[in-house]
C-alpha cells in the first residue's frame, strides 16, 4: 500500500505559542543565603546583618524595563484569511 501524505485538519486560528519562561529574580540567591544564615545562627543574629542589608538593597533596586510583547499572533490573525485561501471563518 503506497504511503499517503498526512493531511492535517483545517485550523480555526493560526497561532504561535510563546515559550513559557519564568522571569529570573536576581534576589533569590541573596534571599536563600539570608534564610540559610538565619537557620544556622538564629533569627536575631548580628552576623547576618550584612546579608540582610544585601537583600534589602537588592529588593529596593529598580526593576528592569519589561520586554516588548511579540506581535506574531496579531499578524497571523490579520493574514489568516489570505493564508487559508479566503475560506470563511466558522
UniProtKB/Swiss-Prot annotation:
GO terms for molecular function: structural constituent of ribosome. Belongs to the mitochondrion-specific ribosomal protein mS37 family. One of its GO terms (cellular component) is mitochondrial small ribosomal subunit. Keywords: Disulfide bond, Mitochondrion, Ribonucleoprotein, Ribosomal protein. Disulfide bonds join 27-58. PANTHER family: 37S RIBOSOMAL PROTEIN MRP10, MITOCHONDRIAL, SMALL RIBOSOMAL SUBUNIT PROTEIN MS37. This is Small ribosomal subunit protein mS37. It is found in: Mitochondrion. Component of the mitochondrial small ribosomal subunit (mt-SSU). Mature N.crassa 74S mitochondrial ribosomes consist of a small (37S) and a large (54S) subunit. The 37S small subunit contains a 16S ribosomal RNA (16S mt-rRNA) and 32 different proteins. The 54S large subunit contains a 23S rRNA (23S mt-rRNA) and 42 different proteins. Component of the mitochondrial ribosome (mitoribosome), a dedicated translation machinery responsible for the synthesis of mitochondrial genome-encoded proteins, including at least some of the essential transmembrane subunits of the mitochondrial respiratory chain. The mitoribosomes are attached to the mitochondrial inner membrane and translation products are cotranslationally integrated into the membrane. InterPro entries: Ribosomal_mS37_fun. One of its GO terms (biological process) is mitochondrial translation.
Amino acid at each position: 500500500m503506497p504511503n499517503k501524505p498526512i493531511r492535517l485538519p483545517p485550523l480555526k486560528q493560526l497561532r504561535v505559542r510563546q515559550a513559557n519562561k519564568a522571569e529570573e529574580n536576581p534576589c533569590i540567591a541573596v534571599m536563600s543565603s539570608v534564610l540559610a544564615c538565619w537557620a544556622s545562627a538564629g533569627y536575631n543574629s548580628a552576623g547576618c546583618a550584612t546579608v540582610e542589608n544585601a537583600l534589602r538593597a537588592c529588593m529596593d533596586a529598580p526593576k528592569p524595563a519589561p520586554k516588548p510583547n511579540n506581535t506574531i499572533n496579531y499578524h497571523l490573525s490579520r493574514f489568516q484569511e489570505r493564508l487559508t485561501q479566503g475560506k470563511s471563518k466558522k
